[in-house]
Amino acid sequence: MKILNLYACLGGNRFLWHDEHEITAVEMDPELARLYSERFPNDTVIVGDAHQYLLDHYKEFDFIWS
């Protein structure tokens, strides 16, 4: 399942999902995004505006967490 994790911060809710999912996390703060990447190295992390990313990519995901 492809999951979009908006406003990811440090990934607290990320612990709800197993590693077999393909997860893309969006976080505005570069430092928080870096820390998220360290905690979840298999996820794709986007540094940017979550709302805009959602508008541009919502059709690419099976589940969206906001």
Residue ranges and their predicted role:
Residues 1-66:
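Conserved active-site and SAM-binding loop architecture
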